[in-house]
Amino acid sequence: MPPPPRRGTSLGSRKSSLAAKRRKTGQVIRRRKSCQSFTLNHLSGAVSFTDMPFPYPVAHDVPLFLAPMAGVSESPFRRLCRRHGADVVVTEFLSAEGIRRENQATISKLRFGADERTIGVQIFGADPDAMREAAALVTDVFQPEYIDINFGCPDKKVVRRNGGSGCLRDLDLVQSVIRAVIAGTHLPVTVKIRSGWSEEMRDPVKIARACQAAGAAVVALHPRTRTQMYTGAANWDEIARVREAVEIPVIGNGDIKSAADAFRMRQQTGCDGVMIARGSFGQPWIFDQARALLEGREMPAAPGVEERFAIALQHAKMVQAYEADPQGAAIEFRKHLGWYVKGLPSSADLRKRLHQVNSFDEVEGIFDDYLRNRERWLADRADGGVGDATVEGATDGTVGDHDGSLEAA
């Protein structure tokens, strides 16, 4: 499939022509009244569940989702994860105000290729009118499979304006936002939530039921409160309770660092789908591994060094083809490189070199040097080099959890 258009290009005439067509025909946007029907089997294993049908195409009984992550789940990474087994991907979270004002930085993040489908577009905001208008524009111009509302972001800048998890302090507002988005699109409207604003207001079942009552077609739960941010453990028991309390599909999210975690979440909670965020960093093959476990097959081994480097370079070339600024793209890609080399011998030294690159050619050169001179790298490690015990910290200040993205780890 061809890659999506480079960033920085204009919307062109598509929006105006679709809007004109709507005015001419008097088209009225209505919420789709029924879900598409899919045949769903029980999960292989000791525990069986009756799965809820999703309102958009999914290829497996228990779909695997790539979480929306600011600065990470851009089109190239979404495409890569789809190739490695993700059933559904979601855009970075996007401001409804930015969309309706056609801010080019925001609009550029809405672009996706045909090979990314099934895809959802995630929007956030506390102004129902802005959310409705943004949903209408996204539907007309970009036509994803569904629109997701962000009620999970704990970022101060977002919640200060009552967006993201800030909405959870007012369930009437949550319902108003959901109904407004539904009024702006014929696509399924889904939500991503946290367990509440604070421990005192913690009630994920009440929140999920309110979302369902307003018309949400799917709910994804990250079982932490906003005040928890990323501390403590995600309370998977709350996913199970929400799953029992509502009649729409429930996606589990939070603390999935490995394929085994994804399998364990499904077993413990009965969730209809599993959403992976940080667990995909530097290992997009986690989806193939999780799929094998969910289907009762032996989990494939993680790629060796050479294959891992090949996947990283494939990712780099996809980014290079997508971004308009090659040097800026290479610098932005440094964080991914740090994740790809995590755990390798002398990975701290390797990461240090990779975090200084200014071009994708430099990346290939460093990888080639590592593969040709492994004995030297290992000797350097013996002389004091270390593995990558600190790679997780490399995300600090680099990747924001603007959709509950890092919260979905």
Labelled PLM ranges:
Residues 2-17:
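Extreme N-terminal basic, low-complexity initiation segments
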